[in-house]
Curated annotation (Swiss-Prot):
Polymerase component of the cleavage and polyadenylation factor (CPF) complex, which plays a key role in polyadenylation-dependent pre-mRNA 3'-end formation and cooperates with cleavage factors including the CFIA complex and NAB4/CFIB. The gene is PAP1. Present with 17100 molecules/cell in log phase SD medium. Residues 525-568 are annotated as: Disordered. Changing residue 485 to R: Abolishes interaction with FIP1. This is Poly(A) polymerase. It comes from Saccharomyces cerevisiae (strain ATCC 204508 / S288c) (Baker's yeast). Its cofactor is Mg(2+); Mn(2+). The keyword Cytoplasm does not apply. The record marks 140, 145, 294, 314-315, 387, 392, 487 as: Interaction with RNA.
Amino acid sequence: MSSQKVFGITGPVSTVGATAAENKLNDSLIQELKKEGSFETEQETANRVQVLKILQELAQRFVYEVSKKKNMSDGMARDAGGKIFTYGSYRLGVHGPGSDIDTLVVVPKHVTREDFFTVFDSLLRERKELDEIAPVPDAFVPIIKIKFSGISIDLICARLDQPQVPLSLTLSDKNLLRNLDEKDLRALNGTRVTDEILELVPKPNVFRIALRAIKLWAQRRAVYANIFGFPGGVAWAMLVARICQLYPNACSAVILNRFFIILSEWNWPQPVILKPIEDGPLQVRVWNPKIYAQDRSHRMPVITPAYPSMCATHNITESTKKVILQEFVRGVQITNDIFSNKKSWANLFEKNDFFFRYKFYLEITAYTRGSDEQHLKWSGLVESKVRLLVMKLEVLAGIKIAHPFTKPFESSYCCPTEDDYEMIQDKYGSHKTETALNALKLVTDENKEEESIKDAPKAYLSTMYIGLDFNIENKKEKVDIHIPCTEFVNLCRSFNEDYGDHKVFNLALRFVKGYDLPDEVFDENEKRPSKKSKRKNLDARHETVKRSKSDAASGDNINGTTAAVDVN
């Protein structure tokens, strides 16, 4: 009788090992991942290790300096310690070239979050290796985003209720969570969840290859972005881990096929759980739909294994759920064809068709005439609220789906005058008018250090898109999207009084037809949609929203949304 360990909350579906044919397909999967650039070089890996070593030294120096300021002796200050942990894709071992490193700085109880954003921030700025830095202290999990020796790093901080943080510390003990506030709990949870996932899969190497493939697939198919209502990296990792538990002896190629089959047929909102949900020592909320109405509202719940268990997919909306399920069905069809030798793995990873899929798009552009750091904060806020706009749009009568794209489009221009800034806002975002921007200097990675550009005033732009599919039986019907769009603009403006300065921060929402999308959303080898010549000019049938005096003064533009959208 087999004594194989059982992983997960149920027994396996199958314990059969891989066949010769399946191993061959697995080899071809790995080759395709290499071809797609999923693996980094040994030198790139060594660079990451060196950067993390420097950050560990900085973490200890940070704790030491804060300790000395609080009148500790030199010996006590050194013993106070400080340690960094990684989490996310790097910790899981599935990072690729250019991936960021999610990094947690753990500090003792006398070091505060304010110290992190002052003392540690200053230590980072002293380093010659620092390329970029953007502190976001007001984020859900307060964060400092940096680029260090060319590597993007997201730094968060957690304070433990103990006087020392030695290098030997691990985070597995639930008692470490005592007496922490919610932000510290959330910060610690990333590393704790990542470590548990690795402990809960039968064969970590099989899991890693399968997860690399799913990450690549999800990015190519534009279903990878927690902020926009799709699963993020941790959620995709847990979904892959659950399939590995059900097929403990399968190779990665088989895991992929079963991944799409099982999840396309899953009885949502039945949760995906890697182990029984645990109680613990804290009076904190643990995911429980029997108690909490909010938990019952989760459409595709994927539950973190580390205490306190949370839903990693609470951001999924009705529209993004539809998109994800469509992609699961496509995955079933293609992987079945791969196993029948009718298609190759490259077919699975083909780019999405988002900008060809819909006739109508809502274009959301955040503008900043100021510093890059100002724009990162403003555009980051706008991005974080797009999901709320999606939820308001998808419940309108006549809208079948409001599908957010997962990647903002970033650009910046030299902008010497206010007239230039107004021109950018007026002409950007439409194929018909975007050539007017050629009169301004576009800032690129290649020219940004030139003296004439480096010191020039700049306008920064971040543009997001929502594809709209309408369900209108009466062709004379129109859909009014003005109210949710206006509420969205007002919400973004309300978060900080600085965002009321319309000479610096602006926000434009425009209703754009597929053939009028700007060139930047298409690859060079893609043929952009064209306007059908036989169709009547529908623009004349649009009832344009007239800007109120306050809107005109503010500089916000919601004209392009049109209050009554003609969807014919």
